Amino acid sequence: MRQEKDAGKGGKNMRVYNFSAGPAVLPEEVLMEAAAEMLDYKGTGMSVMEMSHRSKAYQNIIDEAEADLRELMQIPDNYKVLFLQGGSSQQFAMIPMNLMKNGVADYIITGQWARKAWQEAKLYGKANAIASSEDATYSYIPNCADLPISEDADYVYICENNTIYGTKFWQLPNTKGKALVSDVSSCFLSEPVDVSQYGVIYGGVQKNIGPAGVVIAIIREDLISDECLPGTPTMLKYKTHADNGSMYNTPPAYGIYICGKVFKWLKAQGGLAAMKAYNEKKAKILYDFLDESKLFKGTVVKKDRSLMNVPFITGNQDLDAKFVKEAEAAGFVNLKGHRSVGGMRASIYNAMPMEGVEKLVAFMKEFEENNI
């Protein structure tokens, strides 16, 4: 079920349907544009990979990327957009280093990444786990309507979409006036959001926006200051990057360039509202099949299902392994579940075409008929 694409000059490329959780599928239009500009970006005679980040040409690239992101997300003027490095995992430390003024924070534990963030925060202050879904292998989102928010908490932390377990916060927690910090790595730009409800929104781009190596952090300005925890390195202060337009040091220049192209692609698709509608249709195809299947079943409470990451199992580990192997041979790759949970997982990010999900479901139906 591989997609044969014209590679130019009579050549053909065989493209697979890539269901990887990250790094993940990117829009083909973006990849083709980048390929066309690889040796000569807009008459500069060089690749963006070779370009000085201090050049006017590159300044235009990063400025345009930020402007397009602000337009897509309708980011208020009192929020800074930072293009950072270090992966989302580095934010597990940067957040408490920069925000723990009272030395207290509340965490909602809905998966491995929220748990790791909580464990890291405990190195810097009192980090409270105020709700968790660990009791059911993170298969649901806890009720967050009336949480025991700490009176002196500096912030409340969530991982909004849980890549491994396939759950999503469809309603933000009531933080009782405390700043909400949200890791949106695997749902970034998949739907409209009201940025003003957050203190910090951040995420690694390698799932839904661009290549690995870039982290985007959107931070309310009142949370950015020199008053960080004692000993916070210069490079781990948000103010360092905010004061220098994300170019205190050399940024992940090529990654930001690709992100900028994805922002333009999203605008051409109709923006985030159109993207959410498209993602809902894709996810419905897969979830409807799982709900009716006699072999496969989903692992998440229905009301908390993610549109981006869909875990499923057969209930037999050998059969799971057989499915993953045969799917890969048919051109459906990276369907193996996270090493910590097993089973399968289809990550159907923005750039996954409807056709990819439809053909995956057709393959699953055929596999079911042959193995039930």
Residue ranges and their predicted role:
Residues 27, 205-287, 301, 370-372:
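Active-site C-terminal subdomain of aminotransferase-like
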Residues 13-16, 329, 342-372:
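PLP-dependent enzyme catalytic core of the Aspartate aminotransferase-like
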Residues 45-91, 98, 112, 120:
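Conserved N-terminal alpha-helix of the aminotransferase class I/II PLP-enzyme fold
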